[in-house]
Amino acid sequence: MSIKAEEISSIIKQQIENYHSELKVSDVGTVTYIGDGIARAHGLDNAMAGELLEFSNGVMGMAQNLETNDVGIIILGPYTEIREGDEVRRTGKIMEVPVGEALIGRVVNSLGQPVDGLGPIETTGTRPIEAVAPGVMQRQSVNEPLQTGIKAIDALVPIGRGQRELIIGDRQTGKTSVAIDTILNQADQDMICIYVAIGQKESTVRNAVETLRHHGALDYTIVVTAAASQPAPLLYLAPYAGVAMAEEFMYNGKHVLVVYDDLSKQAAAYRELSLLLRRPPGREAYPGDVFYLHSRLLERAAKLNDSLGGGSITALPFVETQAGDISAYIPTNVISITDGQIFLQSDLFFSGVRPAINAGLSVSRVGGSAQIKAMKTVAGTLRLDLAAYRELESFSQFGSDLDAATRAKLERGKRTVEVLKQDLHKPLKVEKQVLILYALVHKYLDDVPVHDVLRFESEMNTWFDHNRPELLEEIRTTKKLPDEAKLEAALKEFKNTFVPSEEK
């Protein structure tokens, strides 16, 4: 069989005409240094800041330093398999995390991958972890209360939806307990909660998750964890992942509470990365942009205006102090960014005042306008009374011959401190908080022994639940105090049934 030359040429022409090649152009670099969660690569001249890069073994990294010859990369995963000389290629994408309703009830890492063993998360939505905060005209002032269920906070330093309220104190002063109790109190408040655990022990995170599950709070909570054993890049990214998940809900008109526990560990992780990337150190060896690290995170908490759906993100960042020093670098930075702070003091904690809130140093700059009218009425003078009591208490140690007015103030102060104490994981509904504070302010507790005050409160709540539920309902629905004559009559009736116990 002979093949003609014309046939061969026509077949070749046909093949050439039908040939479609898709050229894949990608920038590829070479790893020149690897170690401590950091890589340096040569040849990625077109890489963008914050771009995701892929190593030859599939591990992802993020471009942080763009230099003349090298790119400094933080590695988002195990880096022990990466070697000098390995390929690293650009992806053209920036870091994104999965978002949406499917995340609720799950425990995820900084990359949004599940770590709770309950299978993959069925969601297709993603959001970039770095986003521009809402502008001035997109916001409205804080006007809705966020009830924490903690008497000392709701009365003295109220928090509104869309506020940033710093919780600051030494280690082991109950910071995490305040956050967990606040999450537990959101059960019927139409609020989604996100708990971001940064640099915590895995056992601590497990305990927090079990507490939330036990009280049914995981039904509206997402837990983002970057444990102490994780590489520093994951600790640095965890808060941004948490707020990206929150923004998805906020822009859909929902209300979100985000707890960052705690930002001093994130700052330490960022310091570690910056020093490894050879950025110049500043005060306390933190890099120059450590303020921006936190400001760009916390500015994303906002109350959106009604045309954008009126959603909100409320942020509760934590900062750990050393020996109560709130004038250190990170504490002063975050105090200046937030709308107030709650200062937890170790002296108060160890003396049995829990939550150990120092009313003198704690402040809420915008929460007052969100406080309900009933609470404003009863808690108006509480802060001043408490401050006066603390002052008198320190003077009274030096002399016993005090006049009757001073003694009365001291006795009232003792009862105020006692009323503001609260058991762990027992948040109190706002109407019951108003009730006990009304009783305190109107001198119903003046003749109750100090050691009986909490029992008085507990029995009073039970009595009102059974005998005067309509008064509690009125406070809850109208957010104002009920008719004073009815309230006084009910309190007197209960007081007659209360039997003080003998002195211990």
From Swiss-Prot:
It is a peripheral membrane protein. Transmembrane segments: none annotated. It is found in: Cell membrane. GO terms for cellular component: plasma membrane; proton-transporting ATP synthase complex. ATP binds at residues 169-176. GO terms for molecular function: ADP binding; ATP binding; proton-transporting ATP synthase activity, rotational mechanism. It catalyses: ATP + H2O + 4 H(+)(in) = ADP + phosphate + 5 H(+)(out). Keywords: ATP synthesis, ATP-binding, Cell membrane, CF(1), Hydrogen ion transport, Ion transport, Membrane, Nucleotide-binding, Translocase, Transport. The keyword ATP-binding applies. The keyword Transport applies. The record marks 362 as: Required for activity. It is an enzyme of class 7 (translocase). Pfam families: ATP-synt_ab (PF00006), ATP-synt_ab_C (PF00306), ATP-synt_ab_N (PF02874). Its EC number is 7.1.2.2. Gene3D superfamilies: 2.40.30.20, ATP synthase alpha/beta chain, C-terminal domain (1.20.150.20), P-loop containing nucleotide triphosphate hydrolases (3.40.50.300). NCBIfam families: atpA, PRK13343.1. Produces ATP from ADP in the presence of a proton gradient across the membrane. The alpha chain is a regulatory subunit. Belongs to the ATPase alpha/beta chains family. F-type ATPases have 2 components, CF(1) - the catalytic core - and CF(0) - the membrane proton channel. CF(1) has five subunits: alpha(3), beta(3), gamma(1), delta(1), epsilon(1). CF(0) has three main subunits: a(1), b(2) and c(9-12). The alpha and beta chains form an alternating ring which encloses part of the gamma chain. CF(1) is attached to CF(0) by a central stalk formed by the gamma and epsilon chains, while a peripheral stalk is formed by the delta and b chains. This is ATP synthase subunit alpha 2. The gene is atpA2.
